[in-house]
């Protein structure tokens, strides 16, 4: 088949990659900043400030995926069966992916994990977007304050080393 007749990729590449295994999720849960509201919990790890952990020839998978590809951020969705049936869970996941795509510039260099609660299904997209933006800007302000304090040598409970 001639090259002129071949179809190009119809979908643009997504700007995020997903968290793949339990160890990656656990790292975000343990070292990241957390924020909760009645609809979902958001865990955020700033990968640009996080030094890559390297052991005898092993590269850090989280850090490498951001540096090697054109990936802006990493996304993890942990939707429990308590939230609802498969249709409801998939709707929530589609909405959360769409939110992060819409606000990819805010998510750049971060590893995000969403843990929706059962009330999340009843929110429309715009209310979910409002809560997401409030939480993400709050966490980013918190992380900036913690980073400034660490540079000054002040350690608080929120300034993680």
Swiss-Prot record:
Which Enzyme Commission numbers does its entry carry?
A: 3.1.26.5
Sorted alphabetically, which PROSITE patterns does this protein's record hold?
Answer: RIBONUCLEASE_P (PS00648)
Sorted alphabetically, the keyword list is: Endonuclease, Hydrolase, Nuclease, RNA-binding, tRNA processing
A matching Pfam family: Ribonuclease_P
Going by the record, the broad EC class of this enzyme is hydrolase
Q: Name one GO biological process term.
A: tRNA 3'-end processing
Please write the reaction equations for the catalytic activity of this protein. Answer: Endonucleolytic cleavage of RNA, removing 5'-extranucleotides from tRNA precursor
Query: In this entry, which stretches build a coiled coil?
Result: none
Q: Which domain of life is it from?
A: Bacteria
Q: Which GO terms describe its molecular function?
A: 3'-tRNA processing endoribonuclease activity; ribonuclease P activity; tRNA binding
Provide one Gene Ontology cellular component. Answer: ribonuclease P complex
The reply on keyword Protein biosynthesis is no
Indicate yes or no for the key word Nuclease: yes
What's the stated role of this polypeptide?
RNaseP catalyzes the removal of the 5'-leader sequence from pre-tRNA to produce the mature 5'-terminus. It can also cleave other RNA substrates such as 4.5S RNA. The protein component plays an auxiliary but essential role in vivo by binding to the 5'-leader sequence and broadening the substrate specificity of the ribozyme.
What protein family does this chain belong to? Belongs to the RnpA family.
Mind telling me which HAMAP family this protein's record contains?
Answer: RNase_P
Q: Which PANTHER family match?
A: RIBONUCLEASE P PROTEIN COMPONENT
Tell me how this protein assembles: Consists of a catalytic RNA component (M1 or rnpB) and a protein subunit.
- What is the name listed in the Swiss-Prot or TrEMBL entry for this protein? Ribonuclease P protein component
Which organism is this entry from? Helicobacter pylori (strain ATCC 700392 / 26695)
């Amino acid at each position: 088949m001639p090259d002129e007749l071949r179809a190009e990729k119809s979908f643009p590449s997504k700007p995020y990659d997903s968290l793949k295994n339990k160890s990656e999720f656990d790292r975000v849960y343990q070292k990241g900043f957390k924020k909760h509201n009645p609809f979902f919990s958001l865990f955020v790890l700033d990968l640009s400030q996080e030094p890559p952990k390297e052991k005898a020839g092993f590269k850090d998978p989280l850090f490498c995926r951001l540096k090697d590809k054109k990936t802006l951020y990493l996304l993890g969705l942990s939707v429990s069966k308590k939230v609802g049936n498969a249709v409801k869970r998939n709707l929530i996941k589609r909405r959360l992916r769409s939110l992060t795509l819409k606000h990819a510039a805010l998510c750049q260099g971060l590893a995000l994990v969403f843990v929706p609660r059962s009330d999340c299904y009843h929110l429309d997209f715009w209310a979910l977007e409002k809560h997401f933006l409030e939480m993400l800007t709050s966490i980013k302000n918190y992380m900036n304050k913690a980073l400034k304090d660490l540079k000054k040598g002040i350690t608080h409970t929120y300034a993680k080393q």
